[in-house]
């Protein structure tokens, strides 16, 4: 596998949950958009969503992906364990958020992942996933993997 896309808690509710922040696209819509781009670029992509921190950590530890795109959602601001999982596997990842976490409540402005991420994309709604995938493809091509 080339790219793993991980979505954290409550992202299974996209399309209906706080559309003023997250838009009207569902997670399935976003995944379908990414799948089309991946196919056009001969990239193998897999998708995973969980509301449970430990399951996300297990997925990070077990993946054979060359690069990970993650929207950790609320775990962004709380999970030292997810941070430690990324440090343990030593693989590049791109942190993504639909909303700009720096334009939200104060507690949402701290990310436990940003400083160790290959890159971060915040505030572009569902298009942020597309931007992340394009950069993941660029990374794979740059590394010649």
Swiss-Prot record:
The active site is at residues 22, 97. InterPro entries: DHquinase_II, DHquinase_II_CS, DHquinase_II_sf. Substrate binds at residues 71, 77, 84, 98-99, 108. Pathway: Metabolic intermediate biosynthesis; chorismate biosynthesis; chorismate from D-erythrose 4-phosphate and phosphoenolpyruvate: step 3/7. GO terms for biological process: amino acid biosynthetic process; aromatic amino acid family biosynthetic process; chorismate biosynthetic process; quinate catabolic process. Pfam families: DHquinase_II (PF01220). GO terms for molecular function: 3-dehydroquinate dehydratase activity. Homododecamer. NCBIfam families: aroQ, PRK05395.1-1, PRK05395.1-2, PRK05395.1-3, PRK05395.1-4. Catalyzes a trans-dehydration via an enolate intermediate. This is 3-dehydroquinate dehydratase. It comes from Francisella tularensis subsp. holarctica (strain LVS). The gene is aroQ.
């Amino acid at each position: 596998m080339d790219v793993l896309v991980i979505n954290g808690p409550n992202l299974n509710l996209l399309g209906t949950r706080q559309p003023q922040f997250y838009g009207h696209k569902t997670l399935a819509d976003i995944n379908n958009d990414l799948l089309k781009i991946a196919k056009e670029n001969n990239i193998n992509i897999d998708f995973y969503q969980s509301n449970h921190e430990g399951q996300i950590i297990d997925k990070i530890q077990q993946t054979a992906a060359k690069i990970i795109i993650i929207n950790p959602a609320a775990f962004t601001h709380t999970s030292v364990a997810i941070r430690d999982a990324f440090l343990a596997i030593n693989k590049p990842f791109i942190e993504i958020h639909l909303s700009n976490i720096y334009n939200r409540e104060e507690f949402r402005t701290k990310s436990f992942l940003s400083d160790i991420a290959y890159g971060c994309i915040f505030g572009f709604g569902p298009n942020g996933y597309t931007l992340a995938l394009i950069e993941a493809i660029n990374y794979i091509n740059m590394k010649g993997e």
